């Protein structure tokens, strides 16, 4: 299935990988969001379980192995052809350039050699208190904070 101007939404998985008070971030190497910092993730492959998809995406983008602990958030990202701003409230008369249904998971790091690969231009561990310096989208910050709350409550 093509990612740009798709015929149907694409299921994507994201990983909020925590290691103590640090979180794993990647700088996107491809559209959409090329050049922006975010959590590791990508499109689910045909026949792949959600857990396997999360583990594969994190390993491909960062070299880190993870244990999936649970779902943090389910959301969608719909970007129209025109200006690239997300569509609020659903479909419009504008052609949809990207449409992802995103399932973000809380994950624990199991180790591995940190490196950036495949879809990532960079990867790093960031202290929770330094997140504001990475220009993360507000929804990403909200998902990360929710993941810390989930982890700390268990």
Give names to the regions the model predicted:
Residues 32-35:
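A conserved beta-turn-beta hairpin within the catalytic core of GNAT-like acetyltransferases
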Residues 19, 27:
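A cytosolic small-molecule/anion-sensing beta-strand core signal
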Residues 39-72, 105:
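The catalytic Nudix box helix
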Residues 75-113:
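Active-site-adjacent beta-strand/loop module that shapes the phosphate/pyrophosphate-binding cleft
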Residues 22, 30:
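Short, glycine/serine-rich, charged loops/turns that create anion-binding
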Residues 104, 115-147:
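NUDIX/MutT-family hydrolases
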Residues 1-14, 85, 95-97:
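Acidic, metal-coordinating catalytic segment for phosphate/diphosphate chemistry
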